UniProtKB/Swiss-Prot annotation:
It comes from the Bacteria. It holds the Pfam family FabA. This is 3-hydroxyacyl-[acyl-carrier-protein] dehydratase FabZ. The keyword tRNA processing does not apply. Signal peptide: none annotated. The gene is fabZ. One of its GO terms (cellular component) is cytoplasm. NCBIfam families: fabZ (TIGR01750), PRK00006.1 (NF000582). GO terms for biological process: fatty acid biosynthetic process; lipid A biosynthetic process. Belongs to the thioester dehydratase family. FabZ subfamily. One of its GO terms (molecular function) is (3R)-hydroxyacyl-[acyl-carrier-protein] dehydratase activity. Keywords: Cytoplasm, Lipid A biosynthesis, Lipid biosynthesis, Lipid metabolism, Lyase. The active site is at H48. Its EC number is 4.2.1.59.
Amino acid sequence: MMHIDEILEYLPHRYPFLLVDRVTEVEKGKSIKGYKNVSFNEPFFTGHFPDNPIMPGVLIIEAMAQLSGILGFVTVERKPSDGVVQYLAGSSKARFKRPVLPGDRLDMESEFISGKRGIWKFDCRALVDGEVVCVAEILTAEREV
């Protein structure tokens, strides 16, 4: 398990763009699980949508990419403090099954599919109360900064 202090060592993101609150499981080179508590106070709810707030799908993809980036860093035993970052390089096969609402806990899972020359491919899904809300394949790219 990784608490927020350790997550901050693996992700360069900060408020309001840090979208992983806790890592619950990580198996180096294989898979990772974590979650984001979706609060009504999230800045994106101000405009998406004022009378019917839902978490933007692109931010669900970003949250899964951040979780996948942690798995990538853990696997290669590097951190941003080593002068590298994991960028979201692409997504495919994204499907949104139902909206994510204020008060939901967005549980996320990512499995490593393949990697070559610093490009990593992950099979991801996000759930709320055990129900799948989003699936996607995510690509991250490790780059020196």
